[in-house]
């Protein structure tokens, strides 16, 4: 759903994903399969960025180490057309809506729910004809389209860690503390 609302265009070289965590990596694979796009991925964790690069990201940027605005402008030839934020924190909102290298008419989609507060220069949204959208869950039709994409075999394999359901609380703590790199699947083996 988030990808549909990001106004993605086939072969676009100016798409940015914020987060190289589980959802960001899944989005990367889906964007590659559905739109033939290898996006730029931004995160603050070098290990997660290595996973994103290995998964096919065109470029990876550590938000702590680089001037993101200049780097995005350089890599996208003038700004991102779409930014999809799987973190949803005050800092990532400021990066994206600030308007972090977004082209005129660009779309910023917020998926993550970390939260926080920020200040927005409202005229910059109007002057840049930019769109900010929030997405929480997709439709049944979109789920069907995603499953068809999976069945077609176009989505490349993405490694995941398998853990027993009894470790759910520990897994959530690991996720909260940034100890999970990639995806975890909780199983209930008998």
Go through the PLM ranges and name each one:
Residues 1-66, 70:
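Mid-domain Rossmann-like dinucleotide-binding core that forms the NAD(H)/NADP(H) cofactor-binding site
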Residues 44-45, 114, 138:
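Residues in the short beta-alpha loop(s) of Rossmann-like NAD(P)-binding domains
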Residues 65, 87-88, 112-113:
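Short glycine-/small-residue-rich Rossmann-like dinucleotide-binding loops
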Residues 78, 94-98, 140-190:
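C-terminal hydrophobic helical "lid"/dimerization subdomain
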Residues 100-104:
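Helix-to-beta-strand junctions that scaffold the AdoMet/dcAdoMet cofactor pocket
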Residues 106-109, 119-160:
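Rossmann-fold dehydrogenase core element
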């Amino acid at each position: 759903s988030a990808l549909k609302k990001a106004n993605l265009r086939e072969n676009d070289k100016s798409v940015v994903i914020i987060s190289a965590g589980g959802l960001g990596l899944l989005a990367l694979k889906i964007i590659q399969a559905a739109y033939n796009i290898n996006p730029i991925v931004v995160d603050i964790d070098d290990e997660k960025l290595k996973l994103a690069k290995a998964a096919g990201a065109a470029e990876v940027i550590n938000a702590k180490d680089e001037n993101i605005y200049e780097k995005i402008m350089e890599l996208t030839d003038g700004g991102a057309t779409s930014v999809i934020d799987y973190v949803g924190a005050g800092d990532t909102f400021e990066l994206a809506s600030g308007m972090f290298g977004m082209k005129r008419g660009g779309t910023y989609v917020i998926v993550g729910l970390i939260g926080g507060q920020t200040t927005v220069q409202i005229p910059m949204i109007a002057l840049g004809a930019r769109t900010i959208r929030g997405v929480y869950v997709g439709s049944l039709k979109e789920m069907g389209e995603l499953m068809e994409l999976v069945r077609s075999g176009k989505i490349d394999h993405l490694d995941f860690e398998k853990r027993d359901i009894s470790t759910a609380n520990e897994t959530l703590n690991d996720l909260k503390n940034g100890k999970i790199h990639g995806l975890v699947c909780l199983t209930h083996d008998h």
